[in-house]
Amino acid sequence: MAVSARPARAPRGSDKVKKDKAAQTSGPRQGSRMGKLLGFEWTDVSSWERLVTLLNRPTDPAGLAVFRFLFGLMMVLDIPQERGLSSLDRRYLDGLEVCRFPLLDALQPLPLDWMYLIYTIMFLGALGMMLGLCYRISCVLFLLPYWYVFLLDKTSWNNHSYLYGLLAFQLTFVDAHHYWSVDGLLRARKRNAHVPLWNYAVLRGQIFIVYFIAGIKKLDADWVEGYSMEYLSRHWLFSPFKLVLSEEMTSLLVVHWCGLLLDLSAGFLLFFDASRPIGFVFVSYFHCMNSQLFSIGMFPYVMLASSPLFCSPEWPRKLVAHCPKKLQELLPLRTAPQPSTSCMYKRSRARGSQKPGLRHKLSTAFTLLYLLEQLFLPYSHFLTQGYNNWTNGLYGYSWDMMVHSRSHQHVKITYRDGRTGELGYLNPGVFTQSRRWKDHADMLKQYATCLSRLLPKYNVTEPQIYFDIWVSINDRFQQRIFDPRVDIVQAAWSPFQRTPWLQPLLMDLSPWRTKLQEIKSSLDNHTEVVFIADFPGLHLENFVSEDLGNTSIQLLQGEVTVELVAEQKNQTLQEGEKMQLPAGEYHKVYTVSSSPSCYMYIYVNTTEVALEQDLAYLQELKEKVENGSETGPLPPELQPLLEGEVKGGPEPTPLVQTFLRRQQRLQEIERRRNAPFHERLVRFLLRKLFIFRRSFLMTCISLRNLAFGRPSLEQLAQEVTYANLRPFEPAGEPSPVNTDSSNPNPPEPDSHPVHSEF
């Protein structure tokens, strides 16, 4: 009887809600200035109970459901691509000797077939989230594997991958399946039911924080002065701006200053009704540009999908109302939402106001605590000082997007046998699948610990590991980031204490960047320069390649002593002095001043210059023959210039072969550049089709292995070969080079010295 009585009261509540729909779902009834501007009155937040009532106000679920669908779709597309399902066998091949970088050392990947199962669960969770099918379960099925894979590899961390995990976490708790969902079709109580306002507030707050904190981080002096993304203005997307601005001013005004202003203002522009159309234009243009400028996967499209969250929640119904009637039958409902137990409704004066329950209070507390935590985390680096390097914290949760750009000039890994004292050198990055360990003390410690476990297999006992890593950040001098005299295996490191073997960034030398740019611009096209800064008491050992026939070193600041190893000669340089360095030999540069030294290498690759001259001569000769100005016969070894390589014909010289390969490359680039849009679209779709095809086939193979056991190695090899086929590519289309950073067979340690060469 009690169960049957409940539905009997529902229609009366439903009728009341429909009558007061405008008042309950669109904000305050009174058209006060604050109500029109913010959507609520000051009295709505004047007490805890009123705040609970506000955040649990019934709201149209339509806009939330559209975001749920689009976000789920983006994750379905993201898993085979940026999450790495298509290349999972290269990263987690069973028996692969590789150093990994999880957040916690206890986190380790499962066997390969089980990793495919984890990814399958994540994919099905994203699909269920998109469709609103078993919604809560689907969100959990996506969320748990996603964070497991995310925490498994710090080298792949970035801001947008972190954001995906946060959005999925929020969607797990909100009622995004109350509209346009399979759950709504199966359960009448969920179909087209109100959602509380906090569902929108927490998502809007998250997106607002992403924009605004990113803008605050861009107030960094390097960004404001235009050093962070200095070379971005060379991209063709900025060509319209360069019609009226120089490349330098385009970089400063458009890339840096406009990027700063957009991030600071985007959240506000989207929040207020009057400015929202302007915000939509700028934000959409910004993310469309980013999709072409950077390889950041689904991030621009996720941010585009999040923008309508700031619109009136019923915007999808208004859009459906403008569609043809026949099409409306296939689209989401237009009818008014039904009541939901998740919301608090205003009642008549006689009955009094609805009292907030425990559920409503907990949801309000969750919203406030979550947003406060998100405001705190980007500035929590004073707690996790072990992750602070030249930039604060692990790259990923600080929203300091694109603020810091790095270049690495020199990386040397030295090992010492703890028993014999024998020295040796390792190829930088051996036993790894990433290069990001170079900039982070925590990853360097993990790498050194891993090497100390692996090197005994190569007859190196009790190994000591030393790293000499030179980095330039935002066009500063190349300088050491870690102390090369410290054995990192035994070095102390804690996530909550400052890393003692981290070298400071020489901020006092930042004003030199203007002078360095002037020096670069004064050099001709064939002359290169590298700017170095080093600490007192340290030295740089370097090797000048035989190709660099004209190399010199010039001191800019401090005092150094240059040792020519082969000649056993030393020469001390004062500020402004320079000396020639012999090619094909080692030298050492000692900083003997009490302050850091600054110097530069100036060099010309004479071999490359000679090659360019020879290739230019062959190009000129080919053009003369083709236009008839060259009447004499070509020597047999130069005939391929006109006819290409012919089987059975004369063997072209290495120079001619190089010329022909370059011509072929240039022709291919020109062909692709001038290809019609439909051809480029087909090529793009075929690449994506291969990624999804390989992901599907490799997943099927692994799930079969788990269910029925692994077949013979011969059969597995045939199946993987079939998965690697590109059957849909047009004939003659070259397969793209595998740019996957993972290497299933990393090289063994090299016992020969490895030094940087210019």
From Swiss-Prot:
Matching SUPFAM superfamilies: RmlC-like cupins
Disulfide bridge partners, by residue number: C99-C450
Any one GO molecular-function label of the UniProt entry: vitamin binding
Single biological process term from Gene Ontology: vitamin K metabolic process
Compartments it resides in: Endoplasmic reticulum membrane
GO cellular component: endoplasmic reticulum membrane
Recorded topology in the membrane: Multi-pass membrane protein
List of residues that carry N-acetylalanine: A2
Cytoplasmic side: 2-60, 135-136, 314-363
Lumenal side: 82-113, 158-292, 385-758
Compositional bias per record (Basic and acidic residues), positions renumbered to this chain: 12-22, 749-758
Catalytic activity: 4-carboxy-L-glutamyl-[protein] + 2,3-epoxyphylloquinone + H2O + H(+) = phylloquinol + L-glutamyl-[protein] + CO2 + O2
Entry's transmembrane regions: 61-81, 114-134, 137-157, 293-313, 364-384
Principal subcellular localization: endoplasmic reticulum
EC number: 4.1.1.90
Region (Disordered) residue spans: 1-34, 727-758
SMART domains xrefs: HTTM
Keywords: Acetylation, Disulfide bond, Endoplasmic reticulum, Lyase, Membrane, Transmembrane, Transmembrane helix
Post-translational modification comment from the UniProt entry: The N-terminus is blocked.
Function of the molecule: Mediates the vitamin K-dependent carboxylation of glutamate residues to calcium-binding gamma-carboxyglutamate (Gla) residues with the concomitant conversion of the reduced hydroquinone form of vitamin K to vitamin K epoxide. Catalyzes gamma-carboxylation of various proteins, such as blood coagulation factors (F2, F7, F9 and F10), osteocalcin (BGLAP) or matrix Gla protein (MGP).
Other comment: The vitamin K-dependent protein substrates of carboxylase have usually a propeptide that binds to a high-affinity site on the carboxylase. CO(2), O(2) and reduced vitamin K are cosubstrates.
Subunit structure, interactors included: Monomer. May interact with CALU.
Protein name (record): Vitamin K-dependent gamma-carboxylase
GN (gene name): GGCX
